[in-house]
Amino acid sequence: MKIKSIIPPTLFISAVLTLNGIATAIDNPQVYQQTEYKVVSNIQIDVKGISNEMIDDIATRSGVDPNIVKAIIVEESGGNPNAVGDNGESIGLMQIQPKHHQKRMEELGIVSLFDPQENVILGCAILSDLYDKYGNYEDALSVYNSGNTEDGKAYAERILKK
């Protein structure tokens, strides 16, 4: 007798998802703990192509504070998904420079940084990596902005005050 014939499909799917969650918790408990709950951000922004709830969800799943992500979006692009800065090098909502993040783009399947969802997914991944490396938002934001922990201190302070 096959297992599928004794267990209803919805129960089977639920069991698989639960086991997947347990495996995630064992492999990487920090990720599981961070995605157990949804952080609702205080900052609400009007961005075409992506909802506040979607930004909150992407940020939370990436293990970063949605308020910080939205503050970056406001600071970097003013919420314009078509923003281009730094002489054409920084693109989209979170003003990401693809020349520095090509490998991460490929890993995540990011095709267009002008796509608001893809831009936020990559921006959150970058910020999460930096937070993991430096252990605090001040240094992570400074490096996100300037490439080092010193030159972007004023930027980090502005983001954290929003």
State where each predicted segment sits.
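Sec-dependent N-terminal signal peptides of Gram-positive bacterial secreted proteins and lipoproteins
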Residues: 1-23
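Catalytic glycan-binding domains that act on GlcNAc-containing polysaccharides
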Residues: 31-32, 37-162
